[in-house]
Amino acid sequence: FEGGKQAVAECYRNIISSGGTPLAITDNLNFGSPEDPEIMGQFVNCIKGIKKACVELNFPVVSGNVSFYNQTDGKSILPTPTIGGVGLIKNISEHTAGKINENDLYYTIGETDTKTTALALLTELSQAPIENVNIKVNLEEEKRNGQFILRLFHEKLISSAHDVSDGGIA
């Protein structure tokens, strides 16, 4: 459930960080055998998470693809929801997102989550995926922060933004 929400929220943040208004997504869902009840449960919960995020963020699914039976020697891959999104930049000639200037100030907007940073570090150090870690996505906060950042872009109060995901802030 949370993995589906996370994938949608990450796409939403990426579009906003480039100064665009999120419009729609396409999904690509990769799972092991649907004949395994645990895998089917993961798939169903992932879709429920994607739906919840899309409804709350007003970010509809317009297309998608599902791939099952992704496994080797009877061992399934980890559930892999991949989300691609499109957004709109109303006036590209005034677009400044991504332009970093020498004297720019840096701000953190929203809550920071040490679990995200710690998870990325632990995965790197162990050189193996860490399973069953459940980092919750606050969709209300995602939407509020996203609208705030877009307003800052539109009012030309910021020239760039970057979302914080896997690696956290260093």
Short names for language-model regions:
Residues 1-170:
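Glycine/proline-enriched, intrinsically flexible loops and inter-domain linkers
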